[in-house]
Amino acid sequence: MAIPTFTMRQLLEAGVHFGHHTRRWNPKMAPYLFGVRNGVHIIDLEQSVPMMYRAMQAVRDVVAGGGRVLFVGTKRAAQEKVAESAKRCGQYYVNHRWLGGMLTNWKTISQSIRRLKEMDEQLAVGEQSGRTKKELLNMTREREKLERALGGIRDMGGLPDLLFIIDTNKESLAIQEANKLGIPVVAVVDSNSDPDGVTFPVPGNDDALRAIDTYCELIAGAVLDGLQAEMSAAGIDLGAAEEAPEEVLPAEGAEQAPAQA
């Protein structure tokens, strides 16, 4: 395997170059803008292409070193693709709502994940657990709420080593927490985005479905290449496997120091 390749034409066809109306721009994005067309900022793809490759290389290197990547995209346009792509490459995701402290208060989050797993076990045996139907119904509702919030990280086993983010404005809290812990951030930055705090920015449209699909596919491909490198170093042929291998997780609740950029 190798890091996926792509062309500027592919980015154009996906609408990556379309920013927002000029009145909604963030002046910090000025260096990444090509110009204005019909009142809309046009993103400079001459910069987006090498910056995407740089971001993909960072993702690949983190994974090749045994690190974990957390995909974050809670806006409606990104939710499905973020989850799908993370699962495809054996990584983790948050696509419902970012809970405050999801990184900086990992101990409490771990307790909630443990509670989720306990409820799964209890609901599996149903009334044999000695609980009434009403108690089981209430537990089912609680479990569904926790699954929406934490289902994508229930098996992460510790802090991620890199975040991949769609929409820095919506996910500003995730970026703040990652910055506080020294976890590198790869993020798509639109013309109305704040690139501060993003280790590997990728200038591009963060609203169009085709654009979001493109970013997620490329990052997932970089993850898979990193897994191949990690497995090859261990003498395992990932190419012969149909799915990404399951990660060997540390003990429940154990924290892992994030990789530095």
Curated annotation (Swiss-Prot):
CDD domains: RPS2 (cd01425). GO terms for cellular component: cytosolic small ribosomal subunit. It comes from the Bacteria. This is Small ribosomal subunit protein uS2. Belongs to the universal ribosomal protein uS2 family. GO terms for biological process: translation. The keyword Magnesium does not apply. One of its GO terms (molecular function) is structural constituent of ribosome. SUPFAM superfamilies: Ribosomal protein S2 (SSF52313). InterPro entries: Ribosomal_uS2, Ribosomal_uS2_bac/mit/plastid, Ribosomal_uS2_CS, Ribosomal_uS2_flav_dom_sf. Keywords: Ribonucleoprotein, Ribosomal protein. Pfam families: Ribosomal_S2. Disulfide bonds: none annotated. The keyword Transmembrane helix does not apply.
